[in-house]
C-alpha cells in the first residue's frame, strides 16, 4: 500500500481460479461417473483438489487482509457486494427446487395417483426429527447473533463460546439429517417425490456443511486474534451465510415436510 495512491487492492496473479475451475470439472465428471459406473476415483480427486485450492486461496486472502492491510474500506465494500450477490444466486438456486416441488405437488399427474404425496409414498412425520432440526437451526441462529454482538463489544471469550455452540449445533443438524436419510422409507429414485425431497434437503444439507466449515475457519482465526470490532468481514460473511441457511430451512420445513406430507 506504500506505493499506491488509491484505496483499491490490485491482486497479484494467482493460480487458484484455474485450479478451482479444474477441480469443479473433476467433481462434476466424478459425480456422473459415480452415479453411472459406481466409480469414485474422479470424484475423490476432484474433492481433494477442491479442498487444496480452497485452503490455499483463502490462506492468500487472509494474508492480504490481516497481515498486509490490503482490505481497505473500499475493498471491504466490494467484498460485501460480492457476498450479497452470491447469496442472491443461492436464493435463485433454491427457488428452482421449490418451483419443481410445487409444480409437481399442486397438480399431481395421474401417474402419481392424482394425489400428493404420491400413492405408495409414506412421508416423514414433520413433528419428529424435522421439528428437532428446525429448533436446532433456530438456536444456532441465536448463538451466531450472540457471537456477532460479543465481537462488536470486544468480548473475545463470549464470541468464541457462541461460535463453538453454533458449530456444534451445525454438526448436530448434519448428523440428524444423515440419520433421517438413512431411515427414510423412500429413496431419491422413488419418482418426483423422492427426487424433489432429496435434492432440495440434500442441497440445503450441503450448505450447512459449507457454513459449518466457514464458521470453523472463523473460530480458528479468532483464536489467533484475527478479528477486531471494526475489521471482521470474514466472520460477518459467515454469519450472513448461516442466517440464509436458517431461513431456507424454514421454507423447506413448511413446504416439503409439513405441507407436503
From Swiss-Prot:
CDD domains: Cyt_c_Oxidase_III. It catalyses: 4 Fe(II)-[cytochrome c] + O2 + 8 H(+)(in) = 4 Fe(III)-[cytochrome c] + 2 H2O + 4 H(+)(out). It is a multi-pass membrane protein. GO terms for molecular function: cytochrome-c oxidase activity. PROSITE patterns: COX3. The chain crosses the membrane at residues 16-34, 41-66, 73-105, 129-152, 156-183, 191-223, 233-256. Keywords: Membrane, Mitochondrion, Mitochondrion inner membrane, Translocase, Transmembrane, Transmembrane helix. It is found in: Mitochondrion inner membrane. It is an enzyme of class 7 (translocase). Its EC number is 7.1.1.9. Disulfide bonds: none annotated. InterPro entries: Cyt_c/ubiquinol_Oxase_su3, Cyt_c_oxase_su3_dom, Cyt_c_oxidase-like_su3, Cyt_c_oxidase_su3-like_sf, Cyt_c_oxidase_su3_a-hlx. Residues 35-40, 106-128, 184-190, 257-261 are mitochondrial intermembrane. GO terms for biological process: mitochondrial electron transport, cytochrome c to oxygen; respiratory chain complex IV assembly. Residues 1-15, 67-72, 153-155, 224-232 are mitochondrial matrix. GO terms for cellular component: mitochondrial inner membrane; respiratory chain complex IV. Its main location: mitochondrion. Component of the cytochrome c oxidase (complex IV, CIV), a multisubunit enzyme composed of 14 subunits. The complex is composed of a catalytic core of 3 subunits MT-CO1, MT-CO2 and MT-CO3, encoded in the mitochondrial DNA, and 11 supernumerary subunits COX4I, COX5A, COX5B, COX6A, COX6B, COX6C, COX7A, COX7B, COX7C, COX8 and NDUFA4, which are encoded in the nuclear genome. Component of the cytochrome c oxidase, the last enzyme in the mitochondrial electron transport chain which drives oxidative phosphorylation. The respiratory chain contains 3 multisubunit complexes succinate dehydrogenase (complex II, CII), ubiquinol-cytochrome c oxidoreductase (cytochrome b-c1 complex, complex III, CIII) and cytochrome c oxidase (complex IV, CIV), that cooperate to transfer electrons derived from NADH and succinate to molecular oxygen, creating an electrochemical gradient over the inner membrane that drives transmembrane transport and the ATP synthase. Belongs to the cytochrome c oxidase subunit 3 family. This is Cytochrome c oxidase subunit 3. The lineage of its organism: Eukaryota, Metazoa, Chordata, Craniata, Vertebrata.
Amino acid at each position: 500500500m506504500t506505493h499506491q495512491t488509491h484505496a483499491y487492492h490490485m491482486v497479484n496473479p494467482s493460480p487458484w481460479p484455474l485450479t478451482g475451475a479444474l477441480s469443479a470439472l473433476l467433481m462434476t465428471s466424478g459425480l456422473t461417473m459415480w452415479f453411472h459406473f459406481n466409480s469414485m476415483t474422479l470424484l475423490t480427486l476432484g474433492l481433494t483438489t477442491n479442498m487444496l485450492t480452497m485452503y490455499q486461496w483463502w490462506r492468500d486472502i487472509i494474508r492480504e487482509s490481516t497481515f498486509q492491510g490490503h482490505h481497505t474500506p473500499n475493498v471491504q465494500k466490494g467484498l460485501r457486494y460480492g457476498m450479497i450477490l452470491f447469496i442472491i444466486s443461492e436464493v435463485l438456486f433454491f427457488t428452482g427446487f421449490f418451483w419443481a416441488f410445487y409444480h409437481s405437488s399442486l397438480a399431481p399427474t395421474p401417474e402419481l395417483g392424482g394425489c400428493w404425496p404420491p400413492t405408495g409414498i409414506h412421508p416423514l412425520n414433520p413433528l419428529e426429527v424435522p421439528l428437532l432440526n428446525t429448533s436446532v437451526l433456530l438456536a444456532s441462529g441465536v448463538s451466531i447473533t450472540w457471537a456477532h454482538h460479543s465481537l462488536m463489544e470486544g468480548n473475545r471469550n463470549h464470541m468464541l463460546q457462541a461460535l463453538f455452540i453454533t458449530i456444534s449445533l451445525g454438526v448436530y443438524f448434519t448428523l440428524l439429517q444423515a440419520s433421517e436419510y438413512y431411515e427414510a422409507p423412500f429413496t431419491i429414485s422413488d419418482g418426483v417425490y423422492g427426487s424433489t425431497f432429496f435434492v432440495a434437503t440434500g442441497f440445503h444439507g450441503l450448505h450447512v456443511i459449507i457454513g459449518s466449515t466457514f464458521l470453523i475457519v472463523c473460530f480458528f482465526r479468532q483464536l489467533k486474534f484475527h478479528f477486531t470490532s471494526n475489521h471482521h468481514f470474514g466472520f460477518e460473511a459467515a454469519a450472513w451465510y448461516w442466517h440464509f441457511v436458517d431461513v431456507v430451512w424454514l421454507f423447506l420445513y413448511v413446504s416439503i415436510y409439513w405441507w407436503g406430507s
